Swiss-Prot record:
This is Maturase K. It comes from Diplacus aurantiacus. It is found in: Plastid, Chloroplast. The keyword Chloroplast applies. GO terms for cellular component: chloroplast. Keywords: Chloroplast, mRNA processing, Plastid, RNA-binding, tRNA processing. Coiled coil: none annotated. Signal peptide: none annotated. HAMAP family: MatK (MF_01390). It holds the Pfam family Intron_maturas2. GO terms for molecular function: RNA binding.
């Protein structure tokens, strides 16, 4: 972001919020390309096309300067060559530039906030992160009873997303151009349904839509977060917070008058007074958990559905919201199957001559790797069949053996790294076995040999070197403390460099 600040004239851009000229700047597309390329190497397989170049960007900007291709006219819209030839690469470049430009006001606002208040960093900014979910699973999940498993629907039209962005971006020209681009070049069904997505709006281009979608979801989450955060102090008996509680009840009454026009909402106002509510979300999946009863969760379900449908045009289907009891059901979230299990422990006590046994049941959170969906993802990516038997992948003839092994090893290490928070690692061993044998069969297929002959000729150590997990590397580096580290790695470890869900955990993969 520092490099962008050197290019931008911050005095003018921050004063007028004028983003439209940035669309015609070459460095914007260069920054957008480099950012997506670097992130794809960290978390995905290297499959980024090398067709994009500054020469193509210059030609695209020149065409945008020479002719008014984005001008809508009912008479000549069909004759517009820029609209008629929906070039995949051109659409990809423009969408990457749009995604980068609309994020600039948010990034600059965050930087100015942190620079002006270095001592007072807003906690809500830190909590709105994927890293806040892992402590929630560790610390609070075992103390809850019921969860609302909610699949947030997409808005019915792209115009709703653009209207939401108007509160943050004051440049009308950029918004009009963004609206026109989304309506003309991007199929709305392909945006909201990944299975229908064409090559013209690939996974990298989904960043623009995800940014608009998260901005829309943030609007109603901010109101819900206010009720949740303030209600956590309602049961305090200290006289110092009595005035704050009185003001909070007044704010709730105003929210009822401003945001909610439901007749029976006044009678259900006590819903927001429950302090034991927890809300987490990642992408479209959100969870509302509480210590309350099933009746209490049903009332929250009715309230939230009515609230979202009336004021944010989010139409929920009843089958998209589930009320599950944690002791009987597993929760699928972030590529894990999380559940609360009773772990019995027997303690022998003795008082004088009498001895007796005490049975204690302690709640424990289990985070398991969903092996069946993960194998289905591997089968979809052609690493194995539907039964989990490894198969060879067709690869290009110009790829070297080390390049093939490195690609398989990257997938294996990413899966081990992401699912290190699993309480049971046996499922990961099966995934590693599938990837290792699939890699061996792919190499044997390339050399027109059998797996046994290939491994006998090159040695199995070649595969072990590239497919070694992080735990194995640590044990080899520090052999004297390996016994201690083995006990550590049997427990859950959440790595802080996990910034997005793994593709295979998301049931999507490309090689």
């Amino acid at each position: 972001m520092e490099e962008i600040q050197r290019y931008l004239q911050l005095e003018r851009s921050q004063q007028h919020d004028f983003l439209y000229p940035l669309i015609f700047q070459e460095y914007i597309y260069a920054f957008a390309h480099d950012r997506d390329f670097n992130r794809s190497i960290l978390s995905e397989n290297p499959g980024y096309d090398n067709k994009s170049s500054l020469l193509i960007v210059k030609r695209l900007i020149t065409r945008m300067y020479q002719q008014n291709h984005f001008l809508i006219s009912p008479n000549d819209s069909n004759q517009n060559t820029f609209l008629a030839s929906k070039n995949d690469l051109r659409i990809q470049i423009i969408s990457e530039g749009f995604a980068f430009i609309v994020e600039i006001p948010f990034s600059l606002r965050l930087i100015s906030c942190l620079e002006g208040k270095k001592k007072k960093i807003v906690k809500s900014q830190n909590l709105r992160s994927i890293h806040s979910i892992f402590p929630f699973l560790e610390d609070h999940f075992s103390h809850l009873n019921f969860v609302l498993d909610i699949l947030i629907p997409h808005p019915v039209h792209v115009e709703i997303l653009v209207q939401t962005l108007r509160y943050w971006v004051k440049d009308a020209s950029s918004l009009h151009l963004l609206r026109f681009f989304l309506n003309e070049y991007c199929n709305w069904n392909s945006l909201i349904t990944p299975k229908k997505a064409s090559s013209s709006f690939s996974k990298r281009n989904q960043r623009l839509f995800l940014f608009l979608y998260n901005s829309h979801v943030y609007e109603y989450e901010s109101i819900f977060g206010f009720l949740r955060n303030q209600s956590s102090h309602l049961r305090s008996t200290s006289s110092g917070v009595l005035r704050e509680r009185i003001h909070f009840y007044g704010k709730i009454e105003r929210l009822v008058n401003v945001f909610v026009k439901v007749k029976d909402f006044q009678a259900n106002l006590w819903l927001v007074k429950e302090p034991c509510m927890h809300y987490i979300r990642y992408q479209r999946k959100s969870i509302l958990a509480s210590k309350g009863t099933s009746l209490f969760m049903n009332k929250w379900k009715c309230y939230l559905v009515t609230f979202w449908q009336w004021h944010f045009s989010l139409w929920f289907h009843p089958r998209r919201i589930y009320i599950n009891q944690l002791s009987n059901h597993s929760l699928e979230f972030l590529g894990y199957l999380s559940s609360v299990r009773m772990n019995p422990s027997v303690v022998r006590s003795q008082i004088l001559e009498n001895s007796f046994l005490i049975n204690n049941a302690i709640k424990r959170v289990d985070t398991l790797v969903p092996i069946i969906p993960l194998i289905a993802s591997l089968a979809k990516a052609k690493f194995c069949n539907v039964l989990g038997h490894p198969i060879s992948k067709p690869v290009r003839a110009d790829l070297s053996d080390s390049n093939i092994i490195d690609r398989f090893g990257r997938i294996c290490r990413n899966l081990s790294h992401y699912h290190s928070g699993s309480s049971k690692k046996k499922s990961l061993y099966r995934i590693k076995y599938i990837l290792r044998l699939s890699c061996a069969r792919t190499l044997a297929r390339k050399h027109k040999s059998t797996v046994r002959t290939f491994l006998k000729r090159l040695g199995s150590e070649l595969l072990e070197e590239f497919l070694m997990s992080e735990e194995d590397v640590l044990f080899l580096t520090f052999p004297k403390v390996s016994s201690t580290l083995q006990g550590v790695y049997r427990s859950r470890i959440w790595y802080l460099d996990i910034i997005s869900i793994n593709d295979l955990a998301n049931h999507k993969s490309k090689f």
